[in-house]
């Protein structure tokens, strides 16, 4: 019996290594933050990287601090984006040892893959523009003719370099011959990575700075810049809510992903996809990667996902009061400072039973 249990455990580990291993680099916030990144030997110290990622690390040591920064940003942004949902992305902090919510091809893992992919390319593109990387600089001057009243200038985010280096790093586990996992899981991971990068590309916009006497803005200098990560994460959250469950089946001479409920069409390049349905995340169940919602803060007056009715799954909630101190009765004095008083206010909070 013990031997059977050992075999089942080993099988689960092997399956997970092919699926969740592709985002194990998010665990670099644990061991990568303490590395100086000045020797190629440092790349061997990192857990969770496939050989191809280790080689990228050795060839691009200067890039690795951006990778660590991206891992931090991806975790933080995910938790902020889902703070009002039953699944609040808290499990991403377990990286590189993920729970089933992020290791079984779920809707949640689709979001995290897409966000992580977008975040790394975003971080690298911004690092180029800020002069943090010696291997790249500002983005290329746009080919389009500038409009009336503005000229191209400034230092735009280097999206081209960010996409090239970011995709090479995050897609490596799915393309590695030494990684485990099924062809289906590799395909959905690559697909969701690409969706994240597409949302990032779509966020590129023209940003401008005014020049002129007394702020008249007679001339504007403009450049192409990416929107901030919270905007990109919210776009991906919309895709998460409308994600498509897929199957991996033979179509003609090759296997491809098709929607499970509507398999008459191929999967759209713009939609997130997943293989396994998620639990409702109401009750704590480690086997499903659910932390439950007991003791989660809820909003009594909301009708959205953070409402006490939805967040608490109908179990009810407890109320308590809290005294907060905040600035009040602020006055501006010429010139140039503000003086405020401190006021106490009692607020009522609600937590799920």
UniProtKB/Swiss-Prot annotation:
- Which Gene Ontology terms describe the biological processes this protein takes part in? gastrulation; Wnt signaling pathway
**Where does the secretion signal sit in this chain?**
1-22
Got a GO cellular component term for this one?
Answer: extracellular region
Q: Which residues carry this modification: Sulfotyrosine?
A: 274, 281
Q: How is it modified after translation?
A: Glycosylation is required for protein secretion. Palmitoleoylation is required for efficient binding to frizzled receptors. Depalmitoleoylation leads to Wnt signaling pathway inhibition.
**Where are the glycosylation sites?**
31, 38, 88, 299
What is the first-listed, main subcellular location in coarse terms?
secreted
The entry's keywords:
Developmental protein, Disulfide bond, Extracellular matrix, Gastrulation, Glycoprotein, Lipoprotein, Secreted, Signal, Sulfation, Wnt signaling pathway
Where in the cell?
Secreted, Extracellular space, Extracellular matrix
Disulphides: 78-89, 128-136, 138-155, 208-222, 210-217, 282-313, 298-308, 312-352, 328-343, 330-340, 335-336
Q: Report the Gene3D superfamilies cross-referenced here.
A: 3.30.2460.20
Query: What Gene Ontology molecular function terms does this protein carry?
Result: signaling receptor binding
Give the record's family classification. Answer: Belongs to the Wnt family.
Known partners and oligomeric status: Homodimer. Secreted homodimers form a complex with wnt5a homodimers; tyrosine sulfation of both wnt11 and wnt5a by tpst1 is required for this interaction. Interacts with the transmembrane receptor fzd7/fz7. Interacts with lrp6 and ryk. Interacts with tdgf1/frl1. Interacts weakly with frzb1 and strongly with frzb2/crescent. Interaction with frzb2/crescent antagonizes wnt11 function in the neuroectoderm, but enhances it in mesodermal tissue.
Other known facts: Xenopus and other lower vertebrates contain duplicated wnt11 genes (wnt11 and wnt11b) resulting from an ancient gene duplication event, but the second copy has since been lost in mammals. In addition, X.tropicalis has two very similar wnt11b genes suggesting a further recent duplication event.
The record describes the protein's role as: Ligand for the frizzled7 transmembrane receptor. Primarily acts via non-canonical Wnt pathways mediated by either Ca(2+) and PKC, or by JNK and dvl2/dsh. Depending on the cellular context, can also signal via the canonical Wnt pathway mediated by beta-catenin and dvl2/dsh. May also inhibit canonical Wnt signaling. Maternally initiates dorsal/ventral axis formation by a canonical route, which signals via lrp6. In a complex with wnt5a, activates the canonical and non-canonical processes involved in axis formation.
Task: Report the PANTHER family cross-referenced here.
Answer: PROTEIN WNT, WNT RELATED
- Identify this protein by name: Protein Wnt-11b-1
What gene is it encoded by? wnt11b-1
